[in-house]
């Protein structure tokens, strides 16, 4: 297995532009293409999963709604949320299937939050990561030709109010939380968090990291 992982820090980006770049990357990659992680924040946007139900958008606003091809229902992205897109050839990894990749992503977040003294956990029937019953991280993947794209979105220090305009991930009344609810503002920083996410993800899947 090629155990090299390229990490790209992309800053603040338009959702649709990055989504199309992910699709292009996945469609054109071959057996020699290295796996990549894209770290990004997005301008405010609601994204609807491939099987998303329109009734989960409760209130229209000036925030655009984009139909996506990832799994899951509607969610919200905005600055102050660390998004980690996972562009991996699953076939390269012995004993790794889609469910195990989801578990690895959830454990990446659990281990990252533990470094801040936060006890978090996944739910078997509702992908993502939770703290005291509130959701702190959403997760949705798409698999094409045995390769993953899309990934996770971890709330760090953002305006959570627009989550009230939706049933987050299709769950009515689901409360959201973020890292800034539990730590000092200076620690609720996407750059600091992203380094921890990459460290734990690489350790879980046995990658060597190259940052671009």
Swiss-Prot record:
Name of this protein: Octanoyltransferase
Catalysed transformations (reactions): octanoyl-[ACP] + L-lysyl-[protein] = N(6)-octanoyl-L-lysyl-[protein] + holo-[ACP] + H(+)
Localization in the cell: Cytoplasm
GO terms for MF: lipoyl(octanoyl) transferase activity
EC number: 2.3.1.181
Native species: Haemophilus influenzae (strain ATCC 51907 / DSM 11121 / KW20 / Rd)
Location of the active site: 169
Binding site for substrate: 70-77, 138-140, 151-153
BPL/LPL catalytic domain mapped to chain residues: 31-209
């Amino acid at each position: 297995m090629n155990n090299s992982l390229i990490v790209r820090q992309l800053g603040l980006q338009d959702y649709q532009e990055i989504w199309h770049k992910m699709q292009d990357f996945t469609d054109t990659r071959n057996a020699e293409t290295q796996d990549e992680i894209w770290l990004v924040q997005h301008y405010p946007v609601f994204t609807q999963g491939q099987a998303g139900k329109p009734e989960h958008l409760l209130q229209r606003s000036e925030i655009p709604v984009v139909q996506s091809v990832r799994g899951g229902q509607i969610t919200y992205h905005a600055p102050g949320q660390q998004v980690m897109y996972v562009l991996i050839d699953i076939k390269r990894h012995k004993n790794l299937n889609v469910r195990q990749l989801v578990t690895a992503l959830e454990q990446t977040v659990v281990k990252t939050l533990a470094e801040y003294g936060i006890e978090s956990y996944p739910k078997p029937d509702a992908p993502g990561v939770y703290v005291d019953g509130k959701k702190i991280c959403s997760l949705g993947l798409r698999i094409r030709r045995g390769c993953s794209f899309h990934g996770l979105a971890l709330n760090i220090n953002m305006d959570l109010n627009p989550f009230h305009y939706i049933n987050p991930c299709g769950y009515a009344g689901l409360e959201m939380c973020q890292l800034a609810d539990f730590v000092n503002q200076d620690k609720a920083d996407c750059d600091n968090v992203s380094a921890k996410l990459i460290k734990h993800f690489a350790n879980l899947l046995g990658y060597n990291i190259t940052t671009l």
